[in-house]
């Protein structure tokens, strides 16, 4: 019998590129190289993203020769579901295993306006935010575009059973999306394309901890994707404590990049602000935040943080959250408190993966 380690080594040795990593024009280019008509790309995408088949033999309108070429050249990436947790509010958290044995998290959230999915872009994270479970263990590797796409496909397969669909997505799972920029953009274009999963650009949101050079680059992209900054503090001292990335990309430089993005795109930006008891949740912190954002076309999303056992932070009391919100509103800031979901499962980003890793080391 093969051990898990041997299977993983075998997978690494035999791995082919993921077909989910190809954008439509890249599929057309590959078909041309194979002497095949480029219209076949649309048929292949239909099988992958509309019918969601798991093997090439099911692509019945393709000649066997083409199916064999596809099979010899590309893997249809499938993710092994290790854990599936369902919350009382309908939130579902998936722990998926990748071909090399690493695991990642994906979350399905149910809203009145539809189903939203939160995807992961890296195995682990290098950013080191002191409140986050995702960074425990550091960064292992970037996900390929196809591995990010496969998360959406797998969740959509789960929704097929109840004839539902993924209608929006947020790139706010494990990892820093802008540290995996090229694969991130390929993923977004694949899921946005009408022949792909076809999620509208305005129904997608990318969040960053503040990689300043990539904010300027993202401002030049030709997609109207929503953009969010994980801010969590409006002064340098507190933000550097919560988010060490602030030492590399200072708050004034971050705000300059934000203003460039807003002016270049005309789009409103969202600032995510997690409230940590006794750290950044007092009235004076709200006043600092309002001053920092004055004149910026933005929205603030206040986040009552989920408890992470490996971290020391505590939740801000409910009445303090409302006072913080009121302080911002009184100063003209557009603000909402994020609705809590998945509170009765391992809801914090990276928490389920950290729990699984801990079990494996026992």
From Swiss-Prot:
Binding residue positions for S-adenosyl-L-methionine: 175-176, 207, 230-232, 306
One record GO biological process: rRNA base methylation
Gene3D superfamilies noted in UniProt: 1.10.150.530, Aldolase class I
Required cofactor names: [4Fe-4S] cluster
Chief place where the protein resides: cytoplasm
Residue pairs linked by disulfide bridges in the UniProt entry: 118-349
Cleaved signal peptide residues: none
Binding site for [4Fe-4S] cluster: 125, 129, 132
Keywords of this entry: 4Fe-4S, Cytoplasm, Disulfide bond, Iron, Iron-sulfur, Metal-binding, Methyltransferase, rRNA processing, S-adenosyl-L-methionine, Transferase, tRNA processing
Domain Radical SAM core: 111-344
EC number assigned by the record: 2.1.1.192
Subcellular localization, as worded in the UniProt entry: Cytoplasm
CC cofactor note: Binds 1 [4Fe-4S] cluster. The cluster is coordinated with 3 cysteines and an exchangeable S-adenosyl-L-methionine.
Active site, renumbered: 105 (proton acceptor), 349 (s-methylcysteine intermediate)
Family: Belongs to the radical SAM superfamily. RlmN family.
Protein name: Probable dual-specificity RNA methyltransferase RlmN
The gene coding this protein: rlmN
